[in-house]
């Protein structure tokens, strides 16, 4: 019997479920000012939804699901003409507006207006596979060289003040090597970078051993948006990222996770929370810290925490002193911190911060054609089918109902039947959404 990579008792299973979650995903537009390899969403010009449509989606979300924040995504939400009004709307509903963007359209003036509207934070997606749209100076830069661009946005948010700052990066087979450097860069800027997210690359490739169907109709695999005509590494797993990070940070320790829908030891969302400053990481919180934070926050606000404010994350020192009573990881961090002070007591004037490192492992293809999704998916979004039925669906697979009217199913090529109709191959175009 194979053993899980992490002992089951070492991690806190995040309590997020379909009706009670930390995050919900809103897409006001599918238009983007970048064309990125690896993106899950088709770039559709002039696809902006009206504010009435967006409000309807928010109404449906709130009728079905508790959320601490709304991730405003796309497309790129900063090209959405009503973005300031949308941020105000989300804020007025008692949720935290988080903008997921590539940052190209962000100016200091727009940032200031968004802060006045109530924006809580930004998650910037920056990686070396992003295509046309950025300035020429960023072309052909590797992940480490792009830290200069990341720092530009982190400092912009820090200058405005009071806005959470996160970065996403897709991890490919040839960029895995850079992950430890990005984690080290995040520590260097732990005072202004709150979260680093690593999303493992997933695409359909020529050797994918499945055929694809909607109903009984076979779909040409090259018609599916998220496909590559060349072979790629599409089976990276969260433990592989942990092993790579530990080459630079041997004590790196996750404390919480979301499992897969088909496998309990698929670490779909794997979260590490570390405490430190620019000089040193003192330690990593344990599962009891995560359980306590989630339980207390839910007791107080009747929803689970997603993003914390920069002010809260700057309380690393008080976190160590207070919560060391309850959590082994925090207790170890406190011991290391006290040793750090003994060497030079004046170090007490340096703030300690909390910083999150999150690894996301998208859908995995099972041998029978099933897909193991994130159990309690945080990035659930809205879909209205051709019959007008509103649904909560996976944002990472939204292209399927958008194009085909339903989610695709996969049949292993070696098991495929020979019935009539399965030889009929259809090409689909977009436009099935009743909206």
Predicted feature descriptions by range:
Residues 1-16, 266-435:
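Radical SAM enzyme core and accessory elements
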Residues 2-20, 37-38, 206, 210, ...:
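Conserved N-terminal glycine/acidic-rich loop preference
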Residues 2-30, 154-163:
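N-terminal/domain-start segments enriched in small and hydrophobic, helix-friendly residues
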Residues 15-52, 64:
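Canonical Radical SAM [4Fe-4S] cluster-binding loop centered on the CxxxCxxC motif
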Residues 32, 99, 390:
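Conserved, mostly hydrophobic/aromatic
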Residues 55-72, 80-200:
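Radical SAM/AdoMet-radical enzyme domain recognition
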Residues 140-147, 155, 159-347:
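Radical SAM enzyme [4Fe-4S]-AdoMet core and its adjacent flexible, acidic
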């Amino acid at each position: 019997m194979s053993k899980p990579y992490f002992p089951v008792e070492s991690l806190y299973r995040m309590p997020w479920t379909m009706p009670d979650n930390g995050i919900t995903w809103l897409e006001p537009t599918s238009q983007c000012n970048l064309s990125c390899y690896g993106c899950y969403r088709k770039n559709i010009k002039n696809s902006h939804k009206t504010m009435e449509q967006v409000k309807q989606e928010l109404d449906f979300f709130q009728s079905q699901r508790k959320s601490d924040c709304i991730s405003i995504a796309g497309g790129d939400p900063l090209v959405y003409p009503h973005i300031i009004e949308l941020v105000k709307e989300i804020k007025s509903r008692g949720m935290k507006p988080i903008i997921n963007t590539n940052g190209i359209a962000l100016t200091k003036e727009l940032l200031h207006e968004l802060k006045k509207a109530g924006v809580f934070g930004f998650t910037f997606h920056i990686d070396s596979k992003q295509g046309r749209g950025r300035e020429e100076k960023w072309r052909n830069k590797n992940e480490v060289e792009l830290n200069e661009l990341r720092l530009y946005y982190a400092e912009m948010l820090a200058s405005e003040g009071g806005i959470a700052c996160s970065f996403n990066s897709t991890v490919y087979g040839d960029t895995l090597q850079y992950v430890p450097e990005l984690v080290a860069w995040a520590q260097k800027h732990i005072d202004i970078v709150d979260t680093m997210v690593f999303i493992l690359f997933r695409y359909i490739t020529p050797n994918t051993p499945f055929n694809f169907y909607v109903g009984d109709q076979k779909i040409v695999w090259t018609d599916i948006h998220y496909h590559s005509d060349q072979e790629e590494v599409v089976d990276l797993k969260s433990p592989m990222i942990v092993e790579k990070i530990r080459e630079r940070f041997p004590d790196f320790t996750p404390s919480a996770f979301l499992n897969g829908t088909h496998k309990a030891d698929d670490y779909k969302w794997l979260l590490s929370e570390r405490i430190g400053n620019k000089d040193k990481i003192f330690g990593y919180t344990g599962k009891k810290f995560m359980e306590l934070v989630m339980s207390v926050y839910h007791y107080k606000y009747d929803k689970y925490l997603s993003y914390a404010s920069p002010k809260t994350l700057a309380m690393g020192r008080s976190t160590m002193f207070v919560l060391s009573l309850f959590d082994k990881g925090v207790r170890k961090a406190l011991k290391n911190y006290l040793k750090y002070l003994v060497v030079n007591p004046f170090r007490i004037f340096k703030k300690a911060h909390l910083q999150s490192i999150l690894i996301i492992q998208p859908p995995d293809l099972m041998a029978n054609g099933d897909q193991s999704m994130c159990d309690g998916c945080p990035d659930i979004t809205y879909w209205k089918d051709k019959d007008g039925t509103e649904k909560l669906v996976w944002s990472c697979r939204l292209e399927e109902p958008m194009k085909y009217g339903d989610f695709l199913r996969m049949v292993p090529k070696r098991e495929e039947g020979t019935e009539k109709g399965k030889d009929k191959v259809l090409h689909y175009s977009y436009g099935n959404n009743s909206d």
